[in-house]
Amino acid sequence: MAGARMKSFSNPDETRTPDKTLMELVDLGSVKAARLTVQPGWSWSSCIKPVVGTDTCQANHVGAVVSGRFHIKHNDGSEIDLGPGDAYVCEPGHDGWVVGDEPCVMLEFDATAAATYAKGE
């Protein structure tokens, strides 16, 4: 495999569309990357929980916000507000939701999260 690879989110390898969600995935070999666009009114508990069936999100997220605003509340009590330009890590055991009236666009680079997020059994 080539030492340098690229793919475009404009032509994703896979697309997932749970309620108020557009997840576009590209497979770069050892890494899967995702562009996640979530609409106003989106929350993990209302839009993704019905798909995956767990009490909280069990994915590990590593990414950055491109546009919009997002709030994360972790089971350990920690909470963060994210906006454009913010990089984040969020460990399993959390809920999250869009803040405000514009979509939130995030790029994620954790291979496991990108491969399994918003995907039913």
Predicted regions: what they are:
Residues 35-36, 89-90, 95, 100-119:
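A short hydrophobic beta-strand segment most commonly corresponding to one strand
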Residues 50-76:
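Glycine- and acidic-residue-biased ligand/ion/polar-headgroup-sensing regions
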Residues 43-44, 68-73, 96:
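Short beta-strand segments in beta-sandwich/barrel cores
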Residues 74-94:
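Short acidic-glycine-tyrosine-enriched beta hairpin
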